[in-house]
Amino acid sequence: GLNTLKKVIQGLHEVIKLVNNHA
């Protein structure tokens, strides 16, 4: 459902933050 989608999006944002920090 939407809650799962929101969690996935939040997870992607966290991954993007980590990638940006290591870039």
From Swiss-Prot:
Its main location: secreted. Keywords: Amidation, Amphibian defense peptide, Antibiotic, Antimicrobial, Immunity, Innate immunity, Secreted. GO terms for biological process: defense response to Gram-negative bacterium; defense response to Gram-positive bacterium; innate immune response; killing of cells of another organism. It comes from the Eukaryota. The keyword Secreted applies. It is found in: Secreted. Expressed by the skin glands. It holds the Pfam family Antimicrobial19. GO terms for cellular component: extracellular region. InterPro entries: Antimicrobial_19. The modification Alanine amide is found at A23. Antimicrobial peptide with activity against both Gram-positive and Gram-negative bacteria. Has been tested against X.axonopodis pv. glycines (MIC<2 uM), E.coli ATCC 25922 (MIC=6 uM), S.aureus ATCC 29313 (MIC=6 uM) and P.aeruginosa ATCC 27853 (MIC=50 uM). Belongs to the frog skin active peptide (FSAP) family. Pseudin subfamily. This is Pseudin-B. It comes from Pseudis bolbodactyla. The lineage of its organism: Eukaryota, Metazoa, Chordata, Craniata, Vertebrata.
